[in-house]
Amino acid sequence: MKTTIKLSAAALLLSTCISSQAADFVFSSQLNTAAQTLVVFYSQEGKNKQFKALNKQFDGQLQRAVEIENFAGNYAEVAEIIAPQKSNFSRVLVVGTGKEEDFDKASAAKLGGNIHARLVANKVNTASIIFDDITGLHANAELAANFAHGANLRDHRFEKYKQKPNTHTVSYTFDVTDSKQTQAKYAQLESIQAGVFLARDLTTEVATEMTPIEFVNAAQKLTSLGIKITVLDPAQIKELGMGALEAVGRGSKQGSRLLIAHYQGSSDAPIALIGKGITFDSGGYSIKTGSSIARMKSDMAGAAAVLGTVKAMALTKAEKNVVGVMAMAANMVSESSVAPGDVLRTAEGLSVEVVNTDAEGRLVLSDAMWYARKYFNPEIMVDIATLTGAKVRALGNEYAAIISNDDTLVSQLTYAGKQVNENLWRLPLGYKETLKSDIADLSNVGSSGPGATTAASFLEHFAGDTRWVHIDMAGNALTTEGKNELSPGGTGFGVRLFSEWLLAN
């Protein structure tokens, strides 16, 4: 009996996604022979039963075609074949999955994104994907769900400012062994990708439209999901003694905001996610120069990742107690701005000499970390920020840096990152002696040493005895090209990483 499950557009509607198109996915136990393009998989071992069955049905034409193409089934290798006359398809894509043992959910998601981009570029409207027993393993539901997840992530586009946005997308039918199990796995991923889309759109939006107040307004829309939103304005921030956060926002008319988004899915001690939310970073009086300043609208990507994760946890109805604390400000130049040489007083009580006004992220995070510890007493605290150019020079944009006082958390998060293609590389703590100041307790930049490490060591002063992780995602927030699950614009980095980690631990 044919079983078909069509997925709703609920996650798209809940994402405040600015894209107008949405890929359509149907999971079925029967092949859709009316589709334009058929996609079938082929491992290096050549064990795929469905390929062999189709090849027999098509009188050996598929095998002859892949032999002519010297197709070996390597991962992401594609042989595009004009469909045999006896089929209703126009084309057949034979897609390599590499070695059977290496084809996991992360590989499936990347492949889904790249195949989707190929189909969109070729103006394909409908595609049938055979995912029935592609590996000989019992993981086909998870692989199919993640392939669809990758396709949908790649489909997301931010094109609100284009006169003629590209609205073309693809309707998919997946031939799977267990459509109900596949749909259940995809439903959870659909909730997570709603959080990713939110983070991407917040990050990609231009700075004049995505101010601290507008970011707060976007967060307020999540209350219908059972998320408690609290906002502290500049006067409240100042009253609490959060002098670092208050000072960074002085250069902008809006001032700073502290945004708290709390999803309480359990009575356990909370896990606090702390996000840097600099909606535009001019560098202040230590002003940035060069073309990179155009990317500084994305300096709030850490806060976007935190808000997207809290949303994802609410949509998945996770049994987790997660509080997101986001330090929002625009680092601008005006007569009210912090000047190099100023001394600020943090809520922790430590004074900080501002040697460089472009090292503002650690200042706003310091007060946000203090707030999370004081008012939520979290079991674990993880901060995420586009913090240092030094991280980009050390690791590029394929990895984010992870620095921590807890080896177990590093292992958990690094493993989670591998599962979702958001990779982490550990850097050490140290060089605290370089943060000394002659007139204050701390300098906001190190006098020497590796910049990513000295920035993390500054933040360590505000972690207390809490198990703490710092993630520096500088270079990971924006991409200019489509690749794997990513489309141009904000990446939403961190949402899938945190969601995978929270749901698995």
Regions found by a protein language model. Name each.
Residues 1-22:
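Gram-negative bacterial Sec-dependent N-terminal signal peptides
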Residues 2-3, 7, 104, 187, ...:
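Residues at the start of alpha-helices and the adjacent loop-to-helix junctions
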Residues 3, 10, 27, 83, ...:
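Generic detector of short alpha-helix boundary/capping microenvironments
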Residues 15, 31-32, 315:
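Generic structural signal for beta-strand residues in well-ordered domains
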Residues 21-270, 274-277:
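Short amphipathic alpha-helical segment within the helicase RecA-like ATPase core
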Residues 216-505:
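A generic structural signal for tightly packed, nonpolar segments enriched in small/aliphatic residues
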